[in-house]
UniProtKB/Swiss-Prot annotation:
InterPro entries: ATP_syn_F0_a_bact/chloroplast, ATP_synth_F0_asu, F0_ATP_A_sf. The chain crosses the membrane at residues 38-58, 95-115, 134-154, 199-219, 220-240. The lineage of its organism: Eukaryota, Viridiplantae, Streptophyta, Embryophyta, Tracheophyta. The keyword Cell inner membrane does not apply. HAMAP family: ATP_synth_a_bact. It is found in: Plastid, Chloroplast thylakoid membrane. GO terms for cellular component: chloroplast thylakoid membrane; plasma membrane; proton-transporting ATP synthase complex. Its main location: plastid. It is a multi-pass membrane protein. It holds the Pfam family ATP-synt_A. Key component of the proton channel; it plays a direct role in the translocation of protons across the membrane. This is ATP synthase subunit a, chloroplastic.
Length: 247
């Protein structure tokens, strides 16, 4: 009887687990288009957190920074170092772009683990981290692509396209394909990591007591921060590469 009872409990747990759905969306109709409402909601929350915390931190700037001002100046210095290392001496104009990418992705990733999105009920789907949706990560990757094309064209003009036949015209298809694979690799790496992290936590919570997934959640927080850094570093590296013209 104990074996039978145990088997039934296991099957019930697996049945509950099979009810976990991925990919349901809450749509808003804007004009003739359908947009993912839950992505916009969570993105607005993340933007509000960033703007609110930055405003509070620098509302009374001090010559000798303390508290929140000190923290944000440290973050700015860190982003400047990353940008300078990857882009070179002309990094200055790109610090806001790289910093925005890093902070948005970082806070988005952490919001998936720290904010109780599920208490907000939607007619369809559920709220989750913005980077848990492929549309967000693809949009961020496409922005990066536009940025490095803009950087290259601004620096070299139409001569920028000469890189596609370097070191030999035979490599033209490969060099073109490389520029298309950059946004794909950026978007799918970030999306896959965040989605996999949330699914692992859901699976463990469904099968084992709630205290067991806690170490996995802490690991997820760490790797989420690393993913934000990787995305920002690669974006800066691509921009620097387009300006210098080397691979």
């Amino acid at each position: 009887m104990n074996v039978l009872s145990c088997s039934i409990n296991t099957l019930n747990g697996l049945y509950d687990l099979s009810g976990v759905e991925v990919g349901q969306h809450f749509y808003w109709k804007i004009g003739g288009f359908q947009v993912h409402g839950q992505v916009l909601i969570t993105s607005w929350v993340v933007i509000a957190i960033l703007l609110g915390s930055a405003t509070l931190a620098v509302r009374n700037p001090q010559t000798i920074p303390t508290g929140g001002q000190n923290f944000f100046e440290y973050v700015l210095e860190f982003i400047r170092d990353v940008s300078k290392t990857q882009i070179g001496e002309e990094y200055g104009p790109w610090v806001p772009f790289i910093g925005t990418m890093f902070l948005f992705i970082f806070v988005s990733n952490w919001s998936g683990a720290l904010l109780p999105w599920k208490i907000i009920q939607l007619p369809h789907g559920e709220l989750a981290a913005p980077t848990n949706d492929i549309n967000t990560t693809v949009a961020l990757a496409l922005l990066t692509s536009v940025a490095y094309f803009y950087a290259g064209l601004t620096k070299k003009g139409l001569g920028y396209f000469g890189k596609y036949i370097q070191p030999t015209p035979i490599l033209l298809p490969i060099n073109i394909l490389e520029d298309f694979t950059k946004p794909l690799s950026l978007s799918f790496r970030l999306f896959g990591k965040i989605l996999a992290d949330e699914l692992v936590v859901v699976v463990l919570v469904s099968l084992v007591p709630s205290v067991v997934p806690i170490p996995v959640m802490f690991l997820g927080l760490f790797t989420s921060g690393i993913q934000a850094l990787i995305f920002a570093t690669l974006a800066a590296a691509y921009i620097g590469e387009s300006m210098e013209g080397h691979h």
